[in-house]
């Protein structure tokens, strides 16, 4: 289960006094400042998901993991592999920065937002999730929050697993990590997942031809990593992974034209790095390369037919980051460089393009008595829109032992994507979308309950929108988002409880109308316990009302979508110390609901799996 540590420990061993909870060590995170620090020293709300959590929940997709977390609202055009969006605290899907091992997800470069329905869950060993602005550390996209998916495996050994389930779901996975001498270790993984799916039935959205077929998903994944410790302080690594996905979906049909209802995605990523981990100084230099090819085509004609579309992007990055322990805290500085290139036709842009971005940043964290101060500033120089600066600052006050008040303010931005700049309807004069955010929070430990309550406001300006009359994109939109987030976890005897509540009022600041596809309220509850060696888990999620557009007729009408309560039940049993069997029922009461208007969800689903470790 997710545990929130509340020991106010230091960047060094003696820097911070204890902040009363349990005696377990404080969880270390790397996403906030790009280097390890105790989670309790991160003033922004931070959640960590481990591989053990994912196995306990028996999640078969990254979206199933993220939907359980505070502030996250997932929408999807159907089942596995179908187009999905992540909304964090009411911001746009394009306002979420997704990192893979600290490197920006390549697929987000074309559309402007990350679709994690395509990313293999088998690669995920850990997720670090931070709410609030982080552009002052990472640059573009980090308005609503940052999701950092970490693929590095910590435990040596070999695991073989297999699973089966509803809609002909099947999954086979083999992974191993082995030591080669005292200083070198190698990790390998292979994964195969397939489901026939079901008919997502996009009512009225498929044109004049009904598509009563199953919309399935197939994914094949390979991963490899080599790590070596040269000395106690110096280490290096080389890592690579790739996946080959095929998705069938319901597409819009025009008589006499090919029906582009199949997606084929190839993606590969490679990175290498050198790290220095001294007592006072830490430094790392990391380079990466990724290449994605995303086809949409009619299977009767093939993906190389002239009717098919291809989005192809290559991304190159170099990151140099440094962190120095100073007093009761640290100062960090770094520079990162990114280059993205596309082939002609990508993002409906006739010519290929080349975009470069160089960012320099400074971070600081310091403890002064009962106060904790955190700050960051960054300047980006982009080949398309020039220079842009962001900054953020936070302060925490432990006014009573075990209780803390936190206040923060930050600016962030989102760069225009390829299609908005250079597409047929593009505008090369677009500016970045800009955000100003305020947050106040109380957190503490009361009678064994570890809790946090936050209130926030986010004003987003220069939002890019499409004008139906001029057929162009412009920076004229504004959004005003207000929200409250409450989280708590506690134990009652053998039962472990994790609960969160989100209230989000996300509105168009010009028309005062609700932003589409955001649930106004969410309640999430996780209950875990062990009984006679059986590990049980119950997940509850309430999704409140939301609004969407009915695109089946013009002019498009706004529709209100009702709320729903969902229950999952999971159980695991260790047959031996090496063999574990698991079973799960998702959507236990078979609720009929939609998160995108016109696209059905799966209903009740069953899965059965087993894993053998040695």
Curated annotation (Swiss-Prot):
List of residues binding Ca(2+) 2: 213, 215, 249-250, 261
Name of the gene this protein is made from: btuB
Q: Which residues bind Ca(2+) 1?
A: 199, 211, 213, 215, 250
Q: Tell me which CDD domains the record gives.
A: ligand_gated_channel (cd01347)
Location of the motif TonB C-terminal box: 597-614
Taxonomic lineage is:
Bacteria, Pseudomonadati, Pseudomonadota, Gammaproteobacteria, Enterobacterales
Q: Where in the cell is it found?
A: Cell outer membrane
**UniProt-recorded name of the protein:** Vitamin B12 transporter BtuB
Report keywords, A-Z: Calcium, Cell outer membrane, Ion transport, Membrane, Metal-binding, Porin, Signal, TonB box, Transmembrane, Transmembrane beta strand, Transport
Keyword Cell membrane (UniProt): no
Q: Which organism is it from?
A: Shigella flexneri serotype 5b (strain 8401)
Q: Which GO terms describe its biological process?
A: monoatomic ion transport
